[in-house]
Amino acid sequence: MDSNIDVEILSILSEASAPVGAKIIADSLKDRGYDIGERAVRYHLKVLDENSLTKKLGYSGREITEKGIEELEKANISFRIGSVFSQVIEKLYLSDFPSKVLINTAKFEGDYKTIKEMVLRSFEAGYSVGDYLNIKKKGNTVSVETLCSITFDNFLLKNGIIPTPEYGGIVKFEDYEPVNFEGVIDFKSSSIDPLVAFIMQGKTDVIGVIENGEGLVPANFRVIPKSSEKQFETILKKDMLNSVLAYGTENVLGMNLNPEQIGVVLVGGLTPLCVPHESGYTADISAATQLKDISSMEKKTKGFLEAKKKKGKFKVTPVLSKMLSKMQTINYDIEDKKGNVVVNTAKIPIEYKEEAINALKDSYENKLAISDRLKVECDDKFLNAYTICSLTVDGVFLKNKIPVIPYYGGILEVKADKKRFIEAIDYEGTSLDPHEVFFNKADGKNYILAGIRKVPMSASEKLIELNEKLGWNSIIEIGRPNNDICGVRVEKCMFGITTIGGTNPFANIRKNNIPVEMKTLHKSIDYSELTHYDDI
């Protein structure tokens, strides 16, 4: 189910609080740019019913099923990439601070009192958007609502300043001061909310910042016109939300700006939710979920954040730049089977040596690696594993005069009849390798780490010939020119190739509940250092 209309129908039903009929759905579709009538809607609903994605409730209409909700989260990756940005802009307009605000939500499993105390620690340290919060116990779960940072964007808009949301990421703190973005994802380049991605993959350390001033805090990066600088600074003095970490006109916490921009770094509205999550409490976190009357929220004590003009220690660059640089170091020769390859690395505690090696072998036997070669070495504390990175294949093609452009990395859903990406991030729109972001989502069976490359369509025959000579398990699918591949759009005069992620063997180790510290694009080594997986 990857039709845009089907996705929109599921979206309409998911947002409804009661069953919805075909007429209301048709009207809602027209508001969203789809001019189809009730009869056509009924046809789509019939198909959705047959696939158990919706359920008919007599004359009342349809409701979305659990399977439908799950499908909505996966379907039509090209439709969802960039939708995070468009939703942010829409909600920026619909908000009306200080009366109507946009909230984030989370559901935790655990003790109400303990979770509440943890969330309030973040507020008291100042790491929240505003001083409003709802936290309630519902059965065995604790629900938490915090203000979204888009609320501040709405505040700027109401004061005549147009903000442009660009990135979500994590900011490194030293001695209680923000020093640099450690990682960012462009809202326009991702199928998933950047802050949710960083939080759920364990990339934050808000507790560390609260307790000793060292750690990583979720943050958003906006730009505003440079001509509004004086007006912006006046607004900051009366800012009731007190959520600006830093701002400036040059290298703001490592982020590049053009001469007509001011960069603004906002603490993420999800930050208070990180404290219980980092403490091990199971969480279901959603960003910018709904608009709410601020009068229905409770005021809490909030520590003061001082907005500072601050440059970063280093400039944040997209991972694509690193990939293209590393690609140049690859000189593996297909005929001689000699030369440099790029490897990913994993560090596993030595007490898990036997289990880790078994998991690695299992991955290779199931063709979840680039080739049949890897390197394993042990010291007193760790087993260190090295697997060939998928970038090596790009480098091999480049050495043979075929320009291969890394495009997206993400999670590929693998079924007998179809393969499709269910999450993806553009390599040009992130400073972190997407496979690091999605590492915990791979299960080595139904969901694997994979990537998309773009190649000129005139190079199709030569690429296929070289791939056969290479003889590796690197390419999952070769697309047709001017056609989507695994649900991802490829431009005119190009074709796509889907490549298996070189970190899948490490994801298989993690799936077996073995702790693993993983790095992508780690270094170049000589192919002769690698051995067949049977020999490790």
From Swiss-Prot:
Protein's job: Transcriptional repressor of nitrogen fixation and assimilation genes. Binds to two tandem operators in the glnA and nif promoters, thereby blocking transcription of the genes.
MF terms in GO: DNA binding; identical protein binding
Effect noted on mutating C148A: Decreases response to 2-oxoglutarate
One Pfam match: NRD1_2
Organism of origin: Methanococcus maripaludis (strain DSM 14266 / JCM 13030 / NBRC 101832 / S2 / LL)
Family, similarity comment: Belongs to the NrpR family.
UniProt name for this protein: Global nitrogen regulator NrpR
Presence of keyword Transcription: yes
